[in-house]
Amino acid sequence: MDLKQYVSEVKDWPSAGVSFKDITTIMDNGEAYGYATDQIVEYAKEKNIDIVVGPEARGFIIGCPVAYSMGIGFAPVRKEGKLPREVIRYEYNLEYGTNVLTMHKDAIKPGQRVLITDDLLATGGTIEAAIKLVEQLGGIVVGIAFIIELKYLNGIDKIKDYDVMSLISYDE
């Protein structure tokens, strides 16, 4: 299935000059959403995954059905102040400022094999932060899966030491 046909491109959103890749048009088509989920599950099966991790919010949309299909758990990565129990945190730089992501301190057990999922790889900052959190807890990132990779933003450079799969890629 050509998933690219289900991606909506929204010009000049969220700011002028940006062509936003909207995956909600994959999600609202049961066949396309199911296909995307199944492709990631097939990728993950080879890796003996113990748990799926996804950053908010679209990482939840991708990771939860994958975890459910595999009969394993899902651990969220969230913005600071959104998780109720004791957390670990990772602060990283943005173009104009910083951002903080957190995970529950007990979300990953040392040695667990982890698949990280998200909707889109752009600059790689968010996924790099998720990797750092998983590894801080002793997890082993054995795969990273995206629906879309924006190759022209070179986010893959930040995660080049990991096994990464993307279902759709855009060169420009």
From Swiss-Prot:
GO MF terms held by the record: adenine binding; adenine phosphoribosyltransferase activity; AMP binding
Subunit annotation: Homodimer.
Gene expressing this chain: apt
Primary location recorded for the protein, binned into one broad class: cytoplasm
Gene3D superfamilies the UniProt entry points to: 3.40.50.2020
Record-stated family: Belongs to the purine/pyrimidine phosphoribosyltransferase family.
Enzyme class: transferase
Protein name in the entry: Adenine phosphoribosyltransferase
InterPro entries from the UniProt entry: Ade_phspho_trans, PRibTrfase_dom, PRTase-like, UPRTase/APRTase
Pfam families from the UniProt entry: Pribosyltran
